[in-house]
Amino acid sequence: MKIKIFNIILLFVLTLENCLSQGGNQELPEKYYLTELRGNISLDMEITDLKSNKGMINVLISDESKNEIASATFIKVKGLKAEVSFDSIHPGRYAIQFYHDENQNGKLDLNLIGIPKESYGSSNDVKPVLGPPKFEKMLFNLTENKKVIMVPVN
């Protein structure tokens, strides 16, 4: 199970790195889907209470199987919040994770003992306890159009 989560994170980081390296000084796309979404549900997200208006928000939506990433996006911060909508999602159980990449280096910066220096968060506002949030606690049912407001852990 840990290998699957590691592979998901690795794929996300490599995809972001690829976008950054190919684009040079070009702007990243506002949305970048890792898989083709063909459902009929919309998920609107608002991430509030950010520490600064610098950088980008990186969002990862995973299905309950953990090994298939539903979508990922790179969102500009406007004011101290960021908003994004995902269309065409299938009904199901999903988990959302995000981090605020303030310096736009394509990764969540950590201090010497592994604690994130940049803001991050997850669905259901699951807080980390001696490690990353438990995936099962982040899962939520998506059966109809939904708006999710998320506040980062600073």
What do these predicted ranges mean?
Residues M1-E27:
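Bacterial Sec-dependent N-terminal signal peptides
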Residues L20-I57, I61, L110-N154:
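Primarily secretory-pathway and cell-envelope proteins
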Residues K66-A72, L130-P133:
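Short beta-strand and strand-turn-strand segments in soluble, beta-rich domains
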Residues T73-K78:
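Short beta-strand segments within Ig-like beta-sandwich modules, predominantly Fibronectin type-III
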Residues L80, S85, I89-R93:
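A glycine-anchored, Pro-Gly-centered beta-turn/N-cap motif
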Residues Y94-F98:
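A short tyrosine-centered beta-strand micro-motif
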Residues E102-L110:
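Acidic, glycine-anchored loop motifs typical of Ca2+
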